[in-house]
Amino acid sequence: MSGHSKWATIKHKKGALDAKRGKIFTRLIKEITMAAKQGGDAEKNPRLRSAVAAAKAENMPADNIKRAIQRGTGEIEGVNYEEITFEGYGPGGVAILVEVTTDNRNRTVSEIRHAFGKNGGNMGEAGSVAWMFAKKGSIVIAKAAAKEDDLMNLVLENGADDLKDDGDNWEILCDPNAYEGVLEAVKKAGITPEVAEIGMIPQNYIKLEGNQVNTMVRLLEALEDGDDVQHVYSNVDFDQAQLEQVAG
């Protein structure tokens, strides 16, 4: 089972309920700005195209998107951000990656270290856990939305690597270069994904029990609440019952 996709689904639902629109917009604007540094034409820049699509899905105003692109290309003055990935461990030896976009490295290092230390985790050295993850496209679909055989044929024909049974959902995994094609095929088939993103997918998982589950959730939420944090990935394997209890 892929606990990371269950956590992503729970986060998506909790985010919608909590209506943390300002936080979501801040993260999306940073992603658009960084992506636009590689070129302001979304047709020629897959990362920018994906970032703009994510912003539109959250109903971000077009003017906000335009200004974020212009800051990235240097057309208008903006904050000088850098992207950093921190590595660390949670309870039970769970591996964690934290991707940040920051204008103050020292401040962010201190905040991330504090979040780890206060919530049952610890920072690791560069390279300590990154090798446990691979960059993949992940598209999560409710089982009620599609039959396995039909979905399998659809996604494999459009470049996906695998279709996994993930409890109440199907999870499609693909190479980042195939992500847009697979996602477009899914949408054209009339299927709306629960979650769709390119991220760091763990190659192996660690199962937690008892109090470790609550500690791990608290740590993940503390890291994700960081002002500079864009994404948090881990190789914890939550089961559905554990997450439903946490989401309560």
Curated annotation (Swiss-Prot):
Protein localization: Cytoplasm
Keyword set, alphabetical order: Cytoplasm, DNA-binding, Transcription, Transcription regulation
GO molecular function per UniProt: DNA binding
Chief place of localization: cytoplasm
Gene3D superfamilies registered for this protein in UniProt: 1.10.10.200, 3.30.70.980
Pfam families in alphabetical order: TACO1_YebC_N, Transcrip_reg
Any one of the GO BP annotations: regulation of DNA-templated transcription
Cellular component, GO, one term: cytosol
Source species, domain of life: Bacteria
Family the UniProt entry places it in: Belongs to the TACO1 family.
Protein name: Probable transcriptional regulatory protein Acid345_2125
Gene source species: Koribacter versatilis (strain Ellin345)
